Amino acid sequence: MIYVVATTKVKPEGRAAFIDGAKTCIGETHKEKGCISYELHASVNDPDIFVFVERWETREDLTAHGRAPHLKAWRELSAPLKASPTEIEIISGGEVQKL
């Protein structure tokens, strides 16, 4: 099993658009092969910080997700809404890889 934790800080004025766009991406991602879970969480300390927590059956499933058209659309929509780059960690077999 592969876990992904992706943390993003958004611009305050972009928060609503970020959440709306994320809902679309999440819905499409749940249909993907190998997606066990794909959730968005908001920080309780900072309303502009969001964390995606993902679980995938295999690394190949995660790789396919990275090429999905809806993820490409999400990246394009969310890029101008971010206050800083997304921090991504992939966890597998007890190892953590930071991208």
Task: Enumerate the language-model features and the residues they cover.
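Glycine-rich beta-strand-turn "strand-cap" elements at beta-sheet edges
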Residues: 40-48, 74-99
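Solvent-exposed, non-membrane alpha-helical residues enriched in polar/charged side chains
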Residues: 7, 23, 27, 63, ...
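Short amphipathic alpha-helical segments
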Residues: 14-37, 70-74
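Generic alpha-helical hydrophobic packing signal
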Residues: 3-9, 15, 19, 23, ...
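Short, well-ordered beta-strand segments in beta-rich or mixed alpha/beta enzyme
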Residues: 2-9, 39-66
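Residue-level signal for well-ordered alpha-helical positions
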Residues: 21, 41, 65-68, 77
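PAS/GAF/H-NOX family sensory domains and closely associated sensor/linker modules
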Residues: 13-14, 83
